[in-house]
Amino acid sequence: LGSEQVLVKAAGNAGYAYSAGMNQMATATDTNGNLILDGQMLVVGNWDANNDQINGSSNKAGTVCATMQNGVCIDAAKIKDFFIMANGTAVTSTATNGGYTTMSGTSMAAPVVTGAIAVLHQMWPHMKGKHLVQLVLVTGDKNITGYNENVHGQGLLDMDAATRPVGA
C-alpha cells in the first residue's frame, strides 16, 4: 500500500456485534508488532440518519481480539480503533437497468468515507494516508445516544470537524 493510499472497507451487513474477516486487516501486525497496513485502513459501519442510530443490519465495531493473554486482549490495535460510521441507509444510487434505486448497507456508507478521504487529501495533499485516517477517526462525532465504542467505533464521520484547521 503506497503511503498516500487509504483502504476503505465496508463492515458488512449481517448485523453481527463485531466486524471480522478482511476487516481484521486494519489491525494485523507483523512479527515486530507494527501494523501491516500502517494505519491506512478504515472499516465503515452504516449509520441510519433517518432514525439517528447505527443500522440494525450493519456489523458493529465489536471486540474481536487476535491475541489473548490470561483472558485479556493484548492487541495493540482493535477494529473499533479504525471503525467509523457514515450514512448508508436509503441512499439513491444507479440501478442495473440504467435508472435509479434506493439502497441501504455498509456498501453505501463506504463510498461516503472514500469521498471524505478524497476531499481531505485535496485540502491537505502533504498528508500521508495514515494521517488522513487518523484525522477522520479523531474528529468522529461521538455525540450519539448510547455511544459505545464496541458498537459505534470512533463515531460518525464529521466532515465539519475534519476540515477545520487544527486548533480552530
Please place each PLM-identified region on the residue numbering:
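P-loop NTPase catalytic cores that bind/hydrolyze ATP
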Residues: L1, P111, A118, V138-T139
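A short helix->loop->beta-strand "cap" motif at the edges of active sites that frequently abuts
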Residues: G2-V6, G39
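Active-site environment of divalent metal-dependent phosphoester hydrolases
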Residues: N13-S19
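Metal-dependent catalytic neighborhoods of phosphoester/phosphodiester hydrolases
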Residues: S19-M25
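C-terminal subdomain of the subtilisin-like protease fold in secreted/lumenal serine endopeptidases
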Residues: Q40-V43, Q122-A168
